[in-house]
Amino acid sequence: MGVHGLLPIIRKVASEGIRWLQPEFFSKYYPVLAVDGNLLLYRFFRSPNTPLHTNYQHVLWALKLSRYCRKLKTSPIVVFDNLKPNDFKAEEHEKRSLISSQIVNQRQVVQEQMYFLCNLKNCLIDNNFPTGNFYYEIGPLLSQIGKLLFDLRSLNERDNPFHAQNNAENLENATFVRLIVDKLNDREKTLMIQEKKNHLIHSLRQLLAFSEINDFPSEIRSYLEFILSNLDLECLTLCLKIIKGILTLDELQKAIKLKQTELDKLERRLYRPSPQNIFEIFEILKILGIPASFSPIGVEAEAFASAISQNNLAYAVATQDTDVLLLGSSMISNFLDLNDNFHLPLQIMDPRKIAQELNLTFDGFQDYCLMCGTDFTSRIPKIGPVRALKLIRYYGNAFDVLKALNVEEKYIIPTDYIKKFLTAKKLFTDLPSNNELFSFIHNIPKEFLHLSDSTYLDLEKQVLRIFNVQIEELDAKTPWYYHYELEKDVKSTYEY
């Protein structure tokens, strides 16, 4: 999502292209905004402050967006990705699908860990563990496993001193040497880790056999089998402690709590709004007088939002997707921030100013962004954002850069790179301009900002009734919101 590695470059080299604006002055410069609904909704769904496994998060998001815009005195135009996947992003969709499947597998492992930890807790509470002379029999084996565990952790945590070179100017100059040294170190380290793992597997099999002969509790035997199949070092540490009789209940409860936090994070990464959620958001926004639409087929939401802005229907785009800068629209990057402090300034990025600060034409800036890598283009191997900037500055455009790189043997340009580059350049420059696409936008101020507070609250009540959501849930998400006309009488307004 967005231009890879662009933000660090902007902050270091083109910080003048970023400005901050206090909320009380925001409407003076940005009375109407195009909002990238997909990105902001996904971010809300995955926030740790959003409850999991409920069916009204999207309702809270729509009402929070509405309250936020009324507080800012700005009118939103909300756009979502078309429900039909964009064929131009087929590779990106495959990558995301692969990542999702990896997260699902990781979640399954963590769920199994939680299951065994809870069983161990019951075992510890019931004191269901045989005591006897077998401790003396397996003492050397436990010591051996503990030593292997320590060695593996040390190898996994060992830092490569070359990784400390992260200065932007030195980063790419040191790449070649660093890669050679890293490969040598990684090869040696991999062999050592594999050798230690083989020893550990052998020792764990001995421990498992001993546990079966000496009638260890089934919970511990099952846990050992799980550890043996996954080689989970964290779980092994706890298992050794309980076998030695030194694991406390508090320590185990703390481990369970940490594992639950890890599980929640994985759940949130898989959490996403359904098409039904989107349609219901449209219904809510219509009630509140906020225009909303899907983007045309083959057009991303941020591109459609940029088209709205460039057709003088909005003053900027609210999103965190830096593709908007490549598309040529100003970007409000921390709009509808998840913190409770409304008074933090909003961050605005101006692509023309950024291009100027980078000493590039805007066309050159677009080429630079595409060379950095986007959802539609990949990077050329060995060329990151720093080197790409130097090349675009020197040659002026991507095509002259590619001609020069073809001469140098150390750069290998993928066979389909130019074709994908041209396709992406067309997507980012040919924005929708058909007036019919913007027909859903009409009389925005009259239908939203010009509503009296009492009228707006009545509409809000209607939404809460329809979706059976309590006002307390909404107020908890918008502690900065106040009803400036009703003030003290606001509580009676919500009685229904």
From Swiss-Prot:
Belongs to the XPG/RAD2 endonuclease family. FEN1 subfamily. Mg(2+) 2 binds at D321, D323, D375. One of its GO terms (cellular component) is cytoplasm. It comes from Schizosaccharomyces pombe (strain 972 / ATCC 24843). PANTHER family: FLAP ENDONUCLEASE FAMILY MEMBER, XP-G FAMILY NUCLEASE. Pfam families: XPG_I, XPG_N. Keywords: Endonuclease, Hydrolase, Magnesium, Metal-binding, Nuclease. GO terms for molecular function: 5'-3' DNA exonuclease activity; 5'-3' exonuclease activity; 5'-flap endonuclease activity; DNA binding; metal ion binding. This is Uncharacterized protein C12G12.16c. GO terms for biological process: double-strand break repair via homologous recombination. InterPro entries: 5-3_exonuclease_C_sf, HhH2, PIN-like_dom_sf, XPG-I_dom, XPG/Rad2, XPG_DNA_repair_N. Mg(2+) 1 binds at D36, D81, E300, E302. Binds 2 magnesium ions per subunit. They probably participate in the reaction catalyzed by the enzyme. May bind an additional third magnesium ion after substrate binding. Its cofactor is Mg(2+).
